[in-house]
Design a protein with these regions (language model features):
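Helix-loop-helix units of permease transmembrane domains in multi-pass membrane transporters
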Residues: 106-138
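Hydrophobic/aromatic residues in alpha-helical transmembrane segments
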Residues: 99-103, 151, 184-185, 230
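Terminal transmembrane helical anchor/hairpin motif
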Residues: 17, 25, 42-80, 192, ...
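Long, hydrophobic alpha-helical segments
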Residues: 82-109, 204
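Aromatic- and glycine-rich beta-strand/loop motifs that create alpha-glucan
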Residues: 11-36
Length: 251
């Protein structure tokens, strides 16, 4: 069996690194994609049944501005896609953790797994190696996002009819965008500080901090603070008003 160093010497291209990383990561990617798909498909009917029978909701569930902190208004919950937007806001947390943890794992592997496999960089250099890792991250994000969006779409068709396709695309599309943003942050952090032995803990703390910043900025109404968190870029109730993302956050 050829090891990575011999493959690099023979071919010396980005795709070699990508194929190698893909073989090592595909099980991790497929588990994430399948888990997200099963969870969203199972939770959509449960939450829709709760809205249809409001007496089952906790008495103070709608008080205290809770829904506003996740970008959903109470009135919007009565719309066909309102509850999906509520669920999507929390699944975005999982997407952010996946993206950042996967990126950190790719770029800190030499430290966390005590391996020197990427010290043999003469055939193609670090730039090609990094390109291969980033390509693996992009493919992994596409697969998990496709599984999540497809399961969401099927569940919405089965359990909730009459929804707007444009609004659904905007809501569901925020999941891969959040995943990519946190994945990019993981790439930058992994390149800057590769000696990270706790990539999962780092990713979880970063995503949770981003969520707290967004919730805090919405609570006090501070737009300046909202720029510090990727979750602020995708406010669900605005999709139903302007029918697009707020481009100012991407400038």
């Amino acid at each position: 069996r050829r090891d990575l160093s011999s493959l690099l010497r023979m071919r010396g291209d980005t795709m070699t690194v990508f194929h190698y990383e893909w073989k090592r990561s595909r099980k991790y990617i497929l588990i994430w994609g399948l888990s997200l798909a099963v969870c969203i498909f199972s939770m959509i009917p449960v939450y829709y049944s709760m809205i249809e029978t409001p007496e089952l909701l906790p008495k103070n569930f709608a008080e205290g501005g809770f829904f506003e902190t996740v970008g959903i208004s109470l009135a919007l919950l009565l719309e066909p896609l309102g509850m999906y937007g509520f669920l999507n806001a929390f699944f975005a947390l999982a997407g952010g953790i996946f993206g950042m943890h996967f990126a950190l794992s790719l770029f800190t592997k030499e430290c966390t797994e005590n391996t020197a496999e990427y010290l043999f960089t003469k055939p193609c250099g670090r730039i090609q190696i990094y390109k291969g890792k980033v390509l693996c991250l992009l493919v992994g994000t596409c697969i998990t996002s496709a599984a999540y969006i497809l399961a969401s779409f099927i569940a919405m068709i089965v359990y909730e009819s009459g929804f707007s396709m444009l609004e659904f695309i905007l809501l569901a599309g925020s999941f891969p965008l959040v995943t990519l943003i946190f994945g990019g942050m993981g790439v930058l952090l992994g390149c800057w500080h590769p000696n990270n032995r706790s990539p999962l803990l780092t990713a979880s703390l970063a995503v949770f901090m981003g969520y707290c910043i967004t919730a805090f900025s919405r609570t006090i109404g501070s737009r300046i603070i909202s720029y510090l968190s990727p979750f602020s870029f995708f406010i669900s109730y605005l999709f139903f008003v302007i029918f697009f993302y707020e481009l100012v956050y991407f400038l």
